[in-house]
Amino acid sequence: MFDRVEIRIKSGDGGSGKVSFRREKFVPYGGPDGGDGGDGGNVYLEADSGLYSLLNFKHKRVHKAANGENGMGSRCTGHNGADLVIKVPVGTVATIVEENGQKRVLADLAADGDRTLVARGGQGGLGNTHFVSSTNQAPMLAQKGQPGGEYELILELKLIADVAIIGYPNVGKSSLLSLLTAAKPRVANYPFTTLSPVMGVVERTEGTFVMAEVPGLIEDAHLGRGLGHDFLRHISRTRMVIHLLDGTSDNPIDDMIKVNSELYLYDASLSERPQVVAVNKIDDELVQLRREELTETFKEAGLEVFFISALTGEGVEVLLDKVAEKLAILKAADAPETETDQEIKVFRPAPKGKMGFHITRLEDGWQVEAPEIERIIEHSDIEDLEVRRQIMVLLKHRNVQQALIKAGAVIGQKIITGRLEWYL
């Protein structure tokens, strides 16, 4: 199973605003009519019950949403970029890798249709109609669209099953699963026959439930030995486990303790999963002879044990009755409470066009960091004297010069704002 992948996602860039003036016969002073740029497309992850692995991402690692279109004349706003919805299997956990290398879990898509926003598209830039003032009736300024977000993303698929069958390699997990369900796992008499988790549906009169065989766990699996890390994480998505033991083993209870220890060392919460213990191969004469001894040993440890044969089906129905009983209790406990007084979240848009700035002292002058103004500079012809004059007026209206003087700047010093160099 292809159940872990690293991809790169990028939301769409915002379209740039337009510098345009109304040109119409008999309207000599039409004024500015440049439209705003469209917003870039967002990137979403959505759980889809029709998908079962992350194989679709094996050969396509980069996923981009569409950019917003640039603004146009006649106050026409550019089209927003189309959103990108990336479909993933139910049970996918998405983790963002920050620039500093730290990882942050973004979402756990545990149900069909679950959707989460991964990267918001860049906001479209403002057209020159937004820069009209009493002193500037013909603005030559427009704003470049914001760039979209770009992230490294780790997708991990964890099984979602009601019951997991765990145990040492070659204890009969595949045989038991194939006996109880229509699943067809690979069955052979050697360790690690099953190399990926296999799921099947158990049908009973009181209902159905999903059962998964987790490939064999061995000592030091929590350190990645064998196929440990690949499979231990799947157990976290199950309600309970059938701990299957080999009745012909020298010490079945010791085998159980070692596997449970691996669960605890990987994730302490896994060792708290409800377990039903079953000893397989009761059809073997040796196991029949040891049955009373094993029953007493497990009883002393406070454990109820079921003896079964995955080969002949002996004892399996009794085991299933116990599993179904425990499962019904767990499902009832997990049922959501019907609350009417739920908090309603209100989402409000961020203020558009807010132009804050930050001043930094340099060796040979000052730097003014003003993202919104820098987007205007980036989109403007700063070699044009009229454009430069209008930018300076804009900086003055934002009290940038006043703040520079207050910070200690003196007349004649060089100021850098984006790609524009100017002097106080």
Curated annotation (Swiss-Prot):
Keywords: Cytoplasm, GTP-binding, Hydrolase, Magnesium, Metal-binding, Nucleotide-binding. Its EC number is 3.6.5.-. Residues 161-328 form the OBG-type G domain. GTP binds at residues 167-174, 192-196, 213-216, 280-283, 309-311. One of its GO terms (molecular function) is GTPase activity. CDD domains: Obg (cd01898). GO terms for cellular component: cytoplasm. It is found in: Cytoplasm. It comes from the Bacteria. GO terms for biological process: ribosome biogenesis. InterPro entries: G_OBG, GTP-bd, GTP-bd_Obg/CgtA, GTP-bd_prot_GTP1/OBG_C_sf, GTP1_OBG_dom, GTP1_OBG_dom_sf, OBG_GTPase, OCT_dom. Residues 349-424 form the OCT domain. An essential GTPase which binds GTP, GDP and possibly (p)ppGpp with moderate affinity, with high nucleotide exchange rates and a fairly low GTP hydrolysis rate. Plays a role in control of the cell cycle, stress response, ribosome biogenesis and in those bacteria that undergo differentiation, in morphogenesis control. This is GTPase Obg. It comes from Dehalococcoides mccartyi (strain ATCC BAA-2266 / KCTC 15142 / 195).
